[in-house]
Design a protein with these regions (language model features):
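N-terminal beta-alpha lobe that positions the nucleotide/phosphoryl donor
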Residues: 1-274, 278-297
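Long, charged amphipathic helices and adjacent flexible linkers at domain junctions
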Residues: 323-331, 447-450, 454, 489-491, ...
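Catalytic cores of soluble metabolic enzymes centered on carboxylation/carboxyl-transfer
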Residues: 259, 298-529, 659-665
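Structured functional modules or segments
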Residues: 592-667
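Short, well-ordered beta-strand elements within core beta-sheets of diverse protein domains
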Residues: 168-170, 201, 247, 390-399, ...
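Structured, non-catalytic alpha/beta "coupling" segments that mediate domain-domain communication
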Residues: 87-94, 336, 346, 549-580
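Conserved nucleotide-binding/hydrolysis modules and their immediate coupling elements
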Residues: 307, 516-522, 526-543, 547-554, ...
């Protein structure tokens, strides 16, 4: 076994690997760029080595710097995590030449599966079900259109060396193929240094299901069940779960056996994932094999009780797998939400800045459930433009799928982040969505259910009642505090007074009567329903946690002038609590609407201008591409929101722009 390993990665996955190594008694070495000098993974490791400037191409992606760090610290092995160098065949070869062990698959397996075109040929040879498509390299948009016409629409344009949703486009017409080919090729070149793309049939209404495999250097390979990753946006996974609500045991076994057959065909000897696209009828086709640890591996760990990082380390050290296929048992259900620094109300554009508040939910048992939070940030830390915008992976386990979803919903409500925009409101809304809860999924779920993008819905029904009750409790607590600060003497009898109040929540009035008690308050609604509300919340805390009518509830709280902003179960609203007379007067106050101009196209996030697609004087139609801005390794096409004439262009290709910088103006 190794005495010391180096983690050639950053962020949450580096922290995740360090935790397992520490438990195994193995010392760890972190590497870091200028931007990560104060990062959590650097502080967690036993040693840390600086490897260069912030851009990954000058630090984390430079193989020679990783090898030098190993020599400097005496690290015997390297775990690549995911992304970065994890699937580059040259990396394990260079490590081997330096006498350093790679904690991952052998270079031959990476080469065989890393090329999407060659991997499909290998899968077909191993009798794995494959999607119809053209497995040659496509050289031009015209050739792509010809092939797409032959295959039949819709088609998927994919980077041969791609992954993580980059270099992928769905096209429903020849025009979309031509544009998608250019975008996919550009992203593939910038992300992977390989601009080859291919075209395959896109399965309508598909589900994304993947099989986790693990092999050793003695020819043993097993599968550890499946994960469903159908909730995606721009081909990037958002929510994952294990097992899949679609599969029965027979289909699970069939998919697992095909995954093992493919792994054995390429002598696979580490953790890897075989991805399939599945139809609603349980038919399935091979997509690709990821020759690394997946982002979503925790859900597999939660239902199997296995530590995949530990297994990777042990098989890399030459040990045999400690279990056979018959030993693998799936227990309960796990759900993972990817918490990203992105604004769901602005088409999920990346957000950067300092985490002025970062308070994740408490990890560990929660009744019959378990909460786990894999993260690599802390309060006061910086989310930089140079890297992936992931903040954390929030995982919950419970005996049943619905219980795991309920636990996830509570954990998201209790997850407080401020200083940047984030997608927790969107994730919470997904947890409450009936279609998700029913397991009626497809990779088009988000596009179908949120066609106009995401706006946090106003609270209704039971959610609104809970938020109104919490607002009344918060108002009561704030008034108690004011009385204490003012120095007024409080008669003990004041603990038992009644007060009529009106909670104004999202434009609706909720008349209530608030009765104070020693350890709780009683909120009585207009229909006579009484809810006991108990909480230890203190003014200034970002999350109100307590019980409302006996139900455990967490609600995000932000102070406003004369009120609070509340967020719960994906819904958001401002709440103000009035006396009856104040409510009558407030109803008479005019509300001023803000007008928007729409005459400028602004940069939606800090980024690099990849191209300007129009010229001054050009007449553009609604939906026409205007510019391409790259941020956090993704290209974002900015389109005209209306028919207009371009009067002035302020930016040019290569410009680095701040958020809301003017790119162009309309007449």
């Amino acid at each position: 076994m190794f005495d010391k390993i180096l983690i050639a990665n950053r962020g949450e996955i580096a922290c995740r690997i360090i935790k397992t190594a520490r438990r195994m008694g193995i010392k760890t070495v972190a590497v870091y760029s200028d931007a990560d000098r104060d990062a959590v993974h650097v502080a967690m490791a036993d040693e840390a080595v600086h490897i260069g400037p912030a851009p990954a191409a000058q630090s984390y992606l430079v193989i020679e710097k990783i090898i030098d760090a190993c020599r400097q610290t005496g690290a015997q092995a390297v775990h690549p995590g995911y992304g970065v160098l994890s699937e580059r065949e040259a990396f394990p070869r260079a490590l081997a030449e330096a006498g350093i062990t790679f904690i991952g698959p052998n270079p031959g397996a990476i080469a065989a599966m890393g090329d999407k075109i060659e991997s499909k040929k290998a899968a077909a040879a191993a009798n794995v079900s494959t999607v119809p498509g053209f497995l040659g390299v496509i050289e031009s948009p015209e050739q792509a259109v010809t092939i797409a016409d032959e295959i039949g629409y819709p088609v998927m344009i994919k980077a041969s060396a791609g992954g993580g949703g980059k270099g992928m486009r769905i096209a429903h017409s020849a025009d979309e193929v031509a544009e998608g080919f250019a975008r996919a090729r550009s992203e593939a070149s910038s992300s992977f240094g390989d601009d080859r793309v291919f075209v395959e049939k896109f399965i309508t209404d598909p589900r994304h299901i993947e099989i986790q495999v693990i092999g050793d250097k003695h020819g043993n390979v097993i599968y550890l069940g499946e994960r469903e990753c159908s909730i995606q946006r721009r081909n990037q996974k958002v929510i994952e779960e294990a097992p899949s609500p679609l599969l029965d045991e027979a289909t699970r076994r069939k998919m697992g056996e095909q995954a093992v057959a493919l792994a054995k065909a390429v002598s696979y000897d580490s953790a890897g994932t075989v991805e399939f696209v599945a139809g609603q009828d349980k038919s399935f086709y091979f997509l690709e094999m990821n020759t690394r640890l997946q982002v979503e591996h925790p859900v597999t760990e939660m239902i199997t009780g296995l530590d995949l990082v530990e297994l990777m380390i042990r098989v890399a050290a030459g040990e045999r797998l400690p279990l056979a296929q018959s030993d693998v048992k799936l227990n309960g259900w796990a759900v993972e939400s990817r918490v990203y620094a992105e604004d769901p109300t602005r088409n999920f554009l990346p957000s950067i800045g300092r985490l002025t508040v970062y308070q994740p939910p408490e990890e560990g048992p929660e009744g019959d459930a378990i909460v786990r939070n894999d993260t690599g940030v802390e309060e006061g830390g910086e989310i930089a433009i140079h890297y992936d915008p992931m903040i954390a992976k929030l995982v919950t386990w419970a005996p049943t799928r619905l219980a795991a979803i309920e636990s996830q919903a509570r954990a998201l409500d209790a997850f407080a982040i401020d200083g940047i925009r984030h997608n927790i409101p969107f994730l919470a809304a997904l947890m409450a969505h009936p279609r998700w809860r029913e397991g009626n999924l497809s990779t088009g779920f988000i596009a179908e259910e949120f066609p106009e993008g995401f706006t946090a819905p106003e609270p209704e029904g039971e959610i609104a009642r809970r938020m109104a009750a919490a607002a009344a409790a918060i108002d009561h607590k704030l008034n108690q505090r004011k009385r204490g600060i003012s120095g007024q003497m409080r008669d003990p009898s004041l603990l038992h007074f009644e007060r009529d109040r009106v909670v104004l929540l999202a434009g609706r009035s909720y008349p209530v009567t608030v009765e104070a008690r020693a350890d709780a308050i009683l909120v009585t609604e207009a229909d006579g329903t009484a809810l006991e509300v108990a909480s230890e919340w203190r003014p200034g805390e970002p999350v109100w946690t307590g019980t409302i009518g006996g139900k455990v509830v967490a609600i995000q709280v932000r102070g406003l002038l004369n009120g609070v902003a509340l967020q719960h179960a994906g819904a958001a609203a401002e709440a103000r609590v009035f006396t009856r007379r104040e409510a009558e007067l407030a109803a008479l106050m005019p509300v001023k609407e803000q007008a928007g101009s729409g005459k400028q196209v602004l940069c939606p996030m800090p980024g690099l201008v990849k191209s300007i697609l129009v010229s001054e004087g050009a007449e553009v139609k609604s939906g026409e591409p205007l510019a391409v801005v790259e941020a956090m390794k993704m290209e974002n096409v900015l389109r005209a929101e209306r028919d207009a004439t371009v009067s002035k262009i302020h930016a040019k290709e290569g410009d680095s722009l701040a958020v809301d910088a003017v790119i162009l103006e309309f007449a």
